[in-house]
Each structure stands twice: as structure tokens, then as C-alpha cells.
Amino acid sequence: MLWFKNLMVYRLSRDVSLRAEEMEKQLASMAFTPCGSQDMAKMGWVAPMGSHSDALTHVANGQIVICARKEEKILPSPVIKQALEAKIAKLEAEQARKLKKTEKDSLKDEVLHSLLPRAFSRFSQTMMWIDTVNGLIMVDCASAKKAEDTLALLRKSLGSLPVVPLTLENPIELTLTEWVRSGSAAQGFQLLDEAELKSLLEDGGVIRAKKQDLTSEEITNHIEAGKVVTKLALDWQQRVQFVMCDDGSLKRLKFCDELRDQNEDIDREDFAQRFDADFILMTGELAALIQNLIEGLGGEAQR
């Protein structure tokens, strides 16, 4: 099981029926296929269990995991520039004149298409967890754009997907700042030794503290000077550590060894059983963590 490393959290904005059997067929219509000779990028669904299963969905206890794969052709700018300049020089020599800008622009497209079949590919995979019990969707990535791209693929596959980023009643940075100022987080959470503080002024500074006592006078002085905490490393019940960000995302999730070893009694050769057990364990822990976090940060904004 690929334990999630990051969480971008989204709320289903209205009740929708997300049944795995139906979803399996819908995702199959947009299953991943590699780039053709003239494709810059392709994105589609693959089995979350990799070569161990053909199923595009994996379901347990009302939780669904799916996986998107993206292939991107890599064409470094210097390579394009060099090929374009050579082509322009050749044509200008043959025609004994300088090419116009419009001619050069169309040549760039030609060069791009001629290079594409020989370009290397970069592959990436993004896991998505759909919590049908709590009406949430979590994407395992660190960037909002990547999460939105994956959600867009799901929306296209399903026909519609009414989701919005999870929004809290109070600004997250103000709550995090208060936790650091008081030296105490919400119940179940503990401050660790890492934070980022930003000035509210447009051209103000950014302070990144690592391996530092966040209750120290130095940090307090930054807060008193008007900086707010935009990232804060936290521990939840000595089970999961993570960095809480002011955009509502959780980065660098780290599950304690005791938790990760809980399914060690399952034979590693039985990949499907281990994957299923780890998925149930991870989603159970993270669902509880998210609920605690929403409450600790002052509750979800009214919709």
C-alpha cells in the first residue's frame, strides 16, 4: 500500500452517488494510454494495486482509492532553440532573405513536432481517496494544480463532480499563530519544532524555523512584530506527524512505526490482502485525524 505523503482535502458540495461498480466502468472510458508520437502529455486511470490487479477502483468500508497516471514528453528549451535556429539559418541561406516573425513561429511548431517522437517521457502517479462516508475527497499531492488536474480528470470521467476545497470557519493562519503564541495546540495535537512565519505586509519577510523551540522568545518576537504562522509541524496522538499549511493542505505525512507495522502479520506475498488491510488502517486513521483537525481549527465554514 502506498501510504499517502500529502493531503489536499476537498468537500463534496452536494450529495452524489459514488458507487464503485459504476465508477469502475466510468474510469475505464478514460483509462491511461501512452502518448502517441505527436502528444505532449496524456493522463488517465490505472489500477491502484498496479500489476497485482486490473481493477481501477479499490473499495473498503465506504472508502474508495483510485490512481491517475500522467505521461509528459520532455523537450528542453535549449534543444528546441538549437533545432529552430538551425532550421531558420538553413531556410534563410536557401532563400537569401530574412524570415518574418510569423514564418519563424510556424517553423517552431514544425520543429516541435519533429522532435516529439524522439523525446523522453516523464511519468507520475497521483493517488486519490474518496471518503463516501464523510463526503470528502483527498488527493495525495503537494500542489493545488496537480490536485485540480486529477479532479478534472475524475470530473470528466464521471460527467460531473461537485467539489470545493475544504474551507474552515476561521482563517487557518490565525489559529496556528495562536497555537504557537500560547505554546499549546488543540486537544490531541502537539507542536513540533518547525514552522514558517510570514509578514502580513506585501513586501514583508518570511521566517522558516527548523529544529527550534517554537515557544522561544525569538519566535514570540516575530509574532508580536506582526508575522503569522503559515506552516506548522504537528504531532497527532503520537500516531501521525505532518505539516499543517494555511491553505488547508497537510504535507509530509509521517505515520508512526507502530501504526505501519500493525499489519506485519499478513504475508507480504499476499499483496492484495496487505494492500486492503493497509488501506483500511490508513483511511481510518486519516479520517479521524481530519475530523479532529477540523474541530481543532474552529470547525468547517457553513455552506
From Swiss-Prot:
It comes from Escherichia fergusonii (strain ATCC 35469 / DSM 13698 / CCUG 18766 / IAM 14443 / JCM 21226 / LMG 7866 / NBRC 102419 / NCTC 12128 / CDC 0568-73). This is Recombination-associated protein RdgC. Pfam families: RdgC. PANTHER family: RECOMBINATION-ASSOCIATED PROTEIN RDGC (PTHR38103:SF1). Belongs to the RdgC family. One of its GO terms (molecular function) is double-stranded DNA binding. May be involved in recombination. NCBIfam families: PRK00321.1-1 (NF001460), PRK00321.1-3 (NF001462), PRK00321.1-5 (NF001464). InterPro entries: RdgC. It is found in: Cytoplasm, Nucleoid. GO terms for biological process: DNA recombination; regulation of DNA recombination. The keyword Cytoplasm applies. The gene is rdgC. Keywords: Cytoplasm, DNA recombination. GO terms for cellular component: bacterial nucleoid; cytoplasm.
